[in-house]
Amino acid sequence: MYLHRKILGAVTAAAIMGFAANAQAQIEIQWWHAMGGALGETVNDIAEGFNNSQTDYVLKAIYKGNYTETMTAGIAAFRSGVPPHIMQVFEVGTATMMAAKGAIYPVYQLMADQGMPFDESRYLSAVIGYYTTTEGKLLSMPFNSSTPVVFWNKQAFAAAGLDRAPKTWGEMGEFSAKIIASGGAACGFTVGWQSWSMLENFSAWHDVSFATKENGFAGLDTELVFNSPLHVKTIGQLADWQKDKIFTYGGRRGDGNPLFAEGKCAMLINSSAYYSGLRKSTAFDFGTSELPYWSDVAAAPQNSIIGGATLWVLRGHDDKDYKGVAQFMSYLSDVFVQTFWHQNTGYVPITNAAYELTQRSGYYEQNEGRDVAIIQMSARTPTSNSKGLRLGNFVQIRDIINDELEAIWAGSKTTQQGLDDAVSRGNKLLRKFERSY
């Protein structure tokens, strides 16, 4: 509550300044986003805070549907000559946005053009690395960043005589079997956003390639390689575990969350962003821990990569508009704004200062597990395999991966066949993207 007041506390002063000054029309800045429900309300709080911090601009936060719908609407608006100033785009759209050079206004360039102080070293390297040029220049402003973690039901674990989360994939199987045998839960674990959790982040966590050319960072001629023996071993293990309910497939996105929230599965591998929602929907205490790894992989654990979205600035507006956009980007990076966003959602702060402030405040001691995502992303220096993914047509590639994983779970394809087919089909889309740019 203190942080909310801190952000919005400028309302009185701003209002007084507004009444005292000569009446002038404020310049409207449109921010199209994909945050619905409670997250959308928090977005509105941030917009309100910015509006109350100055009198020249009014920021309109406009919900445009899910990530895909928002990105599609923004692209269509740009082509029609009426783009929003700011558009929220999920991480899989990064390569597409980068390729649209005439449409985007890179954040580092925006801030320089508008004379706004901008120090990229302020930001968590694990967060901004996904969205920078090869020279380390930030293209879009990270906003809602998260990473997959393991949520575990302490009550179900206690029933099996367990008091900690599994650390390795071997323990995932062992602990799940004990919990099921004890009656603590009917299922060991489920997974959400399976391509992101079980292939993209699995690869980074084990420091192996998801795709060649540094996962696409080093060139458009990248190729998918997530059909390696290690990937086949892991996905095959999950497929085998289905027989004993150690693993249960719950759906492509957050569809499996109720299996955990209702106590049916003892563990959930999904985005750290679900933390707040799970706290409200579960009747039991749960912990948060790092992703499991194979103990025989020397490089593991490395670091996980982020999901979520960033804010891209679009071309097509007057310079005076962009001055306000730059002011908002600066406001968004404020330590109190970032701390408010982090503590009121499951997303990580994007600045080192916000993380340090939250540490000093004792928040993590009072909210066990809220720092796991940050530690998991930041404890080790990212490698070429673990700094992120930059692949064209990645939205469609993820759909292909989901199709093939579901064929594996259903038993209609072997693990090797399913992953081979996903790689082959995905590479065709990469070649199509390469030819386009």
PLM segments and residue spans:
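Extracytoplasmic "Venus flytrap"/periplasmic binding protein-like
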Residues: 45, 49, 53-123, 155-167, ...
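Extracytoplasmic/periplasmic substrate-recognition and gating elements
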Residues: 53, 160, 232, 236, ...
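A structural signal for short loop-to-beta-strand junctions that line the ligand-binding cleft
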Residues: 76, 84-85, 116-156, 187, ...
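Hinge/lid segment of periplasmic solute-binding proteins
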Residues: 90-147, 167, 173, 200-204, ...
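Short, solvent-exposed loop/beta-turn-alpha elements that line the ligand-binding surface or hinge
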Residues: 108-123, 208-233, 280-281, 293-303, ...
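Extracytoplasmic/periplasmic solute-binding protein
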Residues: 132-143, 148, 173-223, 265
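Glycine-centered hinge/linker elements that transmit conformational signals in sensory
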Residues: 176-180, 219-250
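C-terminal capping/gating helix-and-loop segments adjacent to ligand/active sites or protein-protein/ligand interfaces
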Residues: 369-425
